[in-house]
């Protein structure tokens, strides 16, 4: 039986009194139908004696004086009444199959006087499963009905004192006056009994016996009208309390769910769950077709109508259910159709055992492995409510079935194993088959890979691996074929509110079949191996070659230097011509891409400094002619394959004469640095020495950059790198200054910088004439020995690794290897120009002697600068900060002998 309430939706909300009176009429009708399901006899109403009203009031007062403990004992004693026994061993009350005339139902709903007085001695015509019996006479202290419906709060005063002839009074005119008098009398009674009723109501609510009292009201004998409508508390306007009272009277008490969180109430795992630990009383099943009206349908009127929406579930649900998830067994005795047998412990409310901490240990509320099969630590008493409506939580109709076939949520098989039935279970099935509902067909396949274990397994197989990170219950695992569960399954926990997602181990990492056939524009190349097929970054962005003269993009090596086309043409015209260029400034004009045409004199000087000579062009032409002559001669004296081979060898030998090492040295060679000296001022000791110190610091910055760009230098230890630069900076500057003096002024003067050139006068003025003479002699050695630019570059790099501490460096072994490599490079450069080994050794001896001659000059300059630093405040010579630090810290180590140069020859 179902009661659908639609208050506040179609019609406006009635007044509170009328609202409460309407519910009282409704519940009185329900109560009378439950107690006396037979036809109504209006004659009993009129046959009531005139003094029945006073007798009922006396019974009501006596009933209120009884303690709640006596009422509870009386209620427990009612279970042995014939009315309670009439429910049968399984506790089913098939109210939806009562055969009642429509006229009697309409009379019970339409006439309010039928709800005032119960009819004793009425036989009931029961349906299936109910016996025709005579209800027991009412006890004097029977409070089943008032205690059950007392939660409704205050009763409607207009009906609380109605007499037996209320039907005649209401049909006459002017009946409202009588109702007002009755209302006043009722209010006086309420004031006297208010305190007792409030205490009784609190005890009833605290004991949580609302659902039990509603059941006893359905099976207890009828009581008097005043006992049913007797004392109550004040009228409450709160709709929440009214809804709570309605739910309690209908057996859907909300008090049992108030302690749950909103998420647990929405999840619904406390609904339709078999009571843990309850006695597994089972009755023989009726065929499924006979149970449609009472078990699987929504109400008594829907038992004969099988809609298309629920037809798949009703037709195949019993076949998909096996075992104790429902306490139902499949039997072929009842005509071969699927049958259900229901235990009496199937509860509508959440079991009290679920509140125990031990009951939640095996429950995962994120993956929903609703392990409800095991017995609880403390089995609760059997729950009285056994007649519930069975629903399939995954049966959402044909529309959902069509959409579910397209889902790809992965293999959700075998996530729950329901427990076996109790020891007294009469179910022939000892195991259950409970798994997640599949959302795809076997033909379509699945997007995710295997989840670590198949759905197969027998009952009691505890070795199955759960795909979602938790272990299955060891009992109740039914064998399944393949990885797909049966299409229809039963969830003991009720409606599942969210779909469990597979763990990361379940996600398929390989490409699917639809991707394997597509190789893409780059063939069968995988992303993880794509780096093996990518060319170096230099292939896409080659290092840009710049002109050594103006800094523009170089077009190649012209006249012995890497220059652009403009500087190539300029040098050819200027070197072959007879014009003399003079600088309008101080011979320190800036030559770049935009100002290279401003000063031809400085541009030509820079070309010579870069090593450009007309002889390099002539040597190149002679080399090409020689190769051509050798090729023509080989064509006459040898087969056709030999000329190509000889030409290739000749080209390789030519490339060896210009190794890559030299190209690097040419590219990293520092440019010309100006001292910033004012040549318009008269020369003085302080001015000249201050300009030299300023030039030394500027050149030191370029030396650091140049050293870091040398091949292999960065492989040294950081401390070794700093030490080598700080010890060799003076020798490097002297050697570079001698080369500039040789190339620019033919060693007649000391070419420190374009704006600082020392002649004889300045040499004397600087008070370092002896040191200047030795430096000029070094510059003349470049001319006497005819040092080439390639030899100069290699010798300069080797000079960097020619002075070390006596105690050695931190990585002395690697320093020695690096120094030896540069010596070999110098010997290779010498060998490229000379074919005679004797001349090569002589040349090597000359160059190494020249390198050894730099060290004594550098030592004299170290001593001079250190003495000058000490007397700088007296002679007004400025020392930049970095120069002062190096001279004050590192130079004393050299002068004291802690740091010594490495000589090629014995001194």
Swiss-Prot record:
GO terms (BP aspect): androgen receptor signaling pathway; intracellular receptor signaling pathway; male gonad development; negative regulation of extrinsic apoptotic signaling pathway; nuclear receptor-mediated steroid hormone signaling pathway; positive regulation of cell population proliferation; positive regulation of gene expression; positive regulation of transcription by RNA polymerase II
What span is annotated as the signal peptide, if there is one?
A: none
* Cross-link Glycyl lysine isopeptide (Lys-Gly) (interchain with G-Cter in SUMO) per UniProt, renumbered positions: 389, 508
Amino acid composition bias (Low complexity), ranges on this chain: 55-76, 200-224
Q: Where is this region: Interaction with KAT7?
A: 612-906
- Which keywords annotate this record? Cytoplasm, DNA-binding, Isopeptide bond, Lipid-binding, Lipoprotein, Metal-binding, Nucleus, Palmitate, Phosphoprotein, Receptor, Steroid-binding, Transcription, Transcription regulation, Ubl conjugation, Zinc, Zinc-finger
Q: Say if the entry is tagged with keyword DNA-binding.
A: yes
Specify the DNA-binding region ranges: 546-619
**What post-translational changes are documented for it?**
Phosphorylated in prostate cancer cells in response to several growth factors including EGF. Phosphorylation is induced by c-Src kinase (CSK). Tyr-522 is one of the major phosphorylation sites and an increase in phosphorylation and Src kinase activity is associated with prostate cancer progression. Phosphorylation by TNK2 enhances the DNA-binding and transcriptional activity. Phosphorylation at Ser-67 by CDK9 regulates AR promoter selectivity and cell growth. Sumoylated on Lys-389 (major) and Lys-508. Ubiquitinated. Deubiquitinated by USP26. 'Lys-6' and 'Lys-27'-linked polyubiquitination by RNF6 modulates AR transcriptional activity and specificity.
**Annotated site, Interaction with coactivator FXXLF and FXXFY motifs, chain positions:** 885
Ranges for the region named Disordered are 36-152, 200-231
Name the residues that bind 17beta-hydroxy-5alpha-androstan-3-one.
693, 740, 865
Q: Where is this cross-link: Glycyl lysine isopeptide (Lys-Gly) (interchain with G-Cter in ubiquitin)?
A: 833, 835
Region feature (Interaction with LPXN): 539-906
Q: Which GO terms describe its cellular component?
A: chromatin; cytoplasm; nucleus
Q: PTM Phosphoserine: at which residues?
A: 67, 81, 261, 638
What PANTHER family is this protein classified in? Answer: KNIRPS-RELATED PROTEIN-RELATED
Subunit structure, interactors included: Binds DNA as a homodimer. Part of a ternary complex containing AR, EFCAB6/DJBP and PARK7. Interacts with HIPK3 and NR0B2 in the presence of androgen. The ligand binding domain interacts with KAT7/HBO1 in the presence of dihydrotestosterone. Interacts with EFCAB6/DJBP, PQBP1, RANBP9, RBAK, SPDEF, SRA1, TGFB1I1 and RREB1. Interacts with ZMIZ1/ZIMP10 and ZMIZ2/ZMIP7 which both enhance its transactivation activity. Interacts with SLC30A9 and RAD54L2/ARIP4. Interacts with MACROD1 (via macro domain).
What else does the entry mention about this protein? In the absence of ligand, steroid hormone receptors are thought to be weakly associated with nuclear components; hormone binding greatly increases receptor affinity. The hormone-receptor complex appears to recognize discrete DNA sequences upstream of transcriptional start sites. Transcriptional activity is enhanced by binding to RANBP9.
Give the protein name, as stated in the record.
Androgen receptor
The organism named in the record is: Canis lupus familiaris
